Swiss-Prot record:
Transmembrane segments: none annotated. It comes from Conus mustelinus (Weasel cone). Keywords: Amidation, Antibiotic, Antimicrobial, Cytolysis, Hemolysis, Secreted, Toxin. Its main location: secreted. GO terms for cellular component: extracellular region. The modification Serine amide is found at S22. GO terms for biological process: defense response to bacterium; killing of cells of another organism. One of its GO terms (molecular function) is toxin activity. This cytolytic peptide has ability to disrupt the integrity of cell membranes from both prokaryotes and eukaryotes. It permeabilizes both negatively charged prokaryotic (PE:PG) and zwitterionic eukaryotic (PC:cholesterol) model membranes. It has potent hemolytic activity on human erythrocytes and exhibits low antimicrobial activity against the Gram-negative bacterium E.coli (MIC>50 uM) and the Gram-positive bacterium S.aureus (MIC=25-50 uM). Intracranial injection causes mice to shuffle backward until the encounter an obstacle, at which time the mouse jump into the air. It is found in: Secreted. Expressed by the venom duct. This is Conolysin-Mt1. The mature peptide does not contain cysteine residue.
Length: 23
């Protein structure tokens, strides 16, 4: 994996959690 992926993946997880909570 590229180092950037390890930074992007956690950010996407946080966004998904926010969407699930708001939903």
């Amino acid at each position: 994996f590229h180092p950037s992926l390890w930074v992007l993946i956690p950010q996407y997880i946080q966004l998904i959690r926010k969407i699930l909570k708001s939903g």
